[in-house]
Curated annotation (Swiss-Prot):
Its main location: mitochondrion. This is LYR motif-containing protein 2. Belongs to the complex I LYR family. It holds the Pfam family Complex1_LYR. GO terms for biological process: mitochondrial respiratory chain complex I assembly. It is found in: Mitochondrion. GO terms for cellular component: mitochondrion. Involved in efficient integration of the N-module into mitochondrial respiratory chain complex I. InterPro entries: Complex1_LYR_dom, Complex1_LYR_LYRM2. Keywords: Mitochondrion, Transit peptide. It comes from Xenopus tropicalis. Residues 1-19 form a transit peptide.
Length: 87
């Protein structure tokens, strides 16, 4: 008798990394909504979506962790720029 899980079920580690990626994506899109110029806002939304789509098929854990770190840095940079623009 085999496992009850479907063959494509994620391991706990994969699930946690996926949640981290989705959380980062949501944070980026929330920050982008704070951009005052509508054209810049659309550009940044498309850029973020394309970056995540382009890397959707990544499976190597080290590469995914590096991409998460890179995304977090870019989010911090965006938040810093937005904070400076408001000042």
């Amino acid at each position: 008798m085999g496992s009850r899980l479907p063959p494509a079920a994620l391991t706990l580690k994969q699930f946690l990394v996926r949640q981290q990626v989705l959380g980062l994506y949501r944070k980026i899109l929330r920050s982008v909504r704070q951009i005052p110029d509508a054209a810049d806002q659309r550009y940044m939304q498309e850029w973020a979506r394309e970056e995540f789509r382009r890397n959707k098929g990544a499976t190597e854990e080290i590469a995914i962790r590096m991409m998460i770190t890179h995304g977090q840095r870019q989010l911090q940079e965006l938040e810093r720029a937005l904070h400076l623009a408001k000042s």
